[in-house]
């Protein structure tokens, strides 16, 4: 129990991520700060990565573990694509990752993963470090998630457009930045839809 609580605390500290699913696609958003304890280790970390043009992944927890998992999932996707099985679905990728996390639960990756994208429809999955998997319409993870989730619960509407969802995700993460010292610098917002993805970057005083 003690080790489990320590792991959960490590996952909760250091970031805020948001995922939103609407009819037009999926939004993945994350702040850019990496912290080591109370020390700001890096102000410009990338926490949103792309397995394909239409599938993204982000995490609360260890960025190094995210990068390793990202490489594994990207290899799985491309291996399937060149075999008789063909491209794997977003649900298939999430299920494969859940199996990996479950198999390593005694020596776990320190992650809370969001996988989102568009295949025949928008999909958004939330996975914890034990391999538990849920499909969500909206979700927030990390140290700033209580603040971000409050914004999402107040304003989420399944009929909102992808642009409206992107704005909501941005505001949810910025709300966390204002209240949570482990979340900071700015926000990357990925808009994933049937034709690919677009990425926006927002900072406290400017848009890039």
Swiss-Prot record:
One of its GO terms (cellular component) is cytosol. GO terms for molecular function: endopeptidase activity; threonine-type endopeptidase activity. The keyword Hydrolase applies. Its main location: cytoplasm. The keyword Cytoplasm applies. Pfam families: Proteasome (PF00227). It is an enzyme of class 3 (hydrolase). Residues 1-14 form a propeptide. GO terms for biological process: proteasome-mediated ubiquitin-dependent protein catabolic process. It is found in: Cytoplasm. Component of the proteasome core, a large protease complex with broad specificity involved in protein degradation. The 20S proteasome core is composed of 14 alpha and 14 beta subunits that assemble into four stacked heptameric rings, resulting in a barrel-shaped structure. The two inner rings, each composed of seven catalytic beta subunits, are sandwiched by two outer rings, each composed of seven alpha subunits. The catalytic chamber with the active sites is on the inside of the barrel. Has a gated structure, the ends of the cylinder being occluded by the N-termini of the alpha-subunits. Is capped at one or both ends by the proteasome regulatory ATPase, PAN. This is Proteasome subunit beta 2. It comes from Saccharolobus solfataricus (strain ATCC 35092 / DSM 1617 / JCM 11322 / P2). The gene is psmB2.
